[in-house]
């Protein structure tokens, strides 16, 4: 019996040791040591493509520049490449970033920004005003993109997964925004001629719309859409599934199309302008 007990203990120790060796062989990177700042010359870019768990802050400026701030080990693990007008940001292969320590922040500057693609858990924060022709933003995974102020001709925002896109103010002509999955889209104030919003899945879209002439609002699945309107035109609303569309404020007319157990709520429309 004593021999059997000793054998069991030995097997347990070997198993634990194997797990520990596996953990240490996975290149788990943790922040330690003093923080460093590294400046890189990246040349002109107007598009950003990021993957992994990097935090990025963007400021529109006259010239392009980049600096990376974090612990030396994590900063050295960041890979930055430019192909054409696209700036690619990622981690070195087979490395795992620890979320329990300081992370890495990239501060980038460029006179133009027309496209942002995020994959993984990256964050992209645009500080101050952004003035551009067209802006396309895609978040795949659990990442997040935030904007202070956007002035442009057209926007196209898309969330796939559980990520988020938010904007405090947008002035544009045409706005397209889609949520596929459980993510969120939030527009504190959006002024446009035409908007087309779709929620497919269990996600949410909240927007304050001003002086929008035509609105195409679609919910497919169990998601929710909350629209507050200021002096808007016609809203064509479709709910297919168990989701809901809630409208409040002032608009000229509403066209409803409900398929399933969903709902299009117009009880909080204070007035319908004719």
Question: What do the PLM-derived regions correspond to, one by one?
Answer:
Residues 2-9, 18-140, 146-158, 166-176, ...:
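Acidic (Asp/Glu) and glycine-rich low-complexity loops/linkers
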Residues 141, 161, 181:
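Conserved G/P- and acidic residue-centered "switch" motifs that form tight phosphate/ATP-binding loops
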Residues 167-274:
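Short, surface-exposed interaction patches in beta-rich subdomains
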């Amino acid at each position: 019996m004593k021999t059997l007990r000793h054998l069991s203990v030995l097997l347990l120790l070997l198993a634990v040791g194997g797990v520990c060796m596996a953990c240490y062989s996975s290149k788990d990177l943790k922040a330690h040591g003093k923080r460093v700042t590294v400046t890189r010359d990246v040349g002109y870019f107007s598009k950003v493509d990021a993957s992994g768990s990097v935090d990025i802050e963007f400021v529109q400026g006259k010239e392009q520049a980049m600096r990376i701030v974090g612990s030396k080990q994590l900063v050295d693990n960041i890979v930055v490449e430019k192909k054409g007008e696209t700036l690619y940001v990622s981690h070195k292969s087979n490395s795992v970033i620890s979320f329990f320590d300081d992370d890495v922040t990239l501060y980038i500057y460029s006179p133009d920004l027309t496209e942002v693609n995020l994959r993984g858990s990256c964050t992209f924060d645009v500080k101050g005003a952004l003035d551009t022709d067209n802006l396309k933003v895609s978040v795949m995974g659990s990442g997040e993109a935030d904007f202070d102020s956007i002035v442009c001709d057209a926007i196209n925002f898309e969330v796939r997964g559980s990520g988020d896109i938010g904007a405090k103010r947008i002035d544009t002509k045409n706005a397209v925004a889609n949520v596929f999955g459980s993510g969120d889209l939030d527009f504190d104030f959006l002024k446009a001629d035409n908007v087309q919003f779709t929620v497919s899945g269990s996600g949410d879209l909240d927007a304050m719309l001003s002086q929008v002439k035509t609105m195409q609002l679609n919910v497919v699945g169990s998601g929710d859409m909350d629209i507050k309107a200021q002096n808007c035109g016609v809203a064509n609303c479709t709910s297919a599934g168990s989701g809901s569309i809630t409208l409040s404020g002032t608009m000229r007319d509403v066209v409803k199309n409900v398929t399933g157990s969903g709902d299009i709520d117009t009880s909080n429309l204070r007035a319908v302008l004719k």
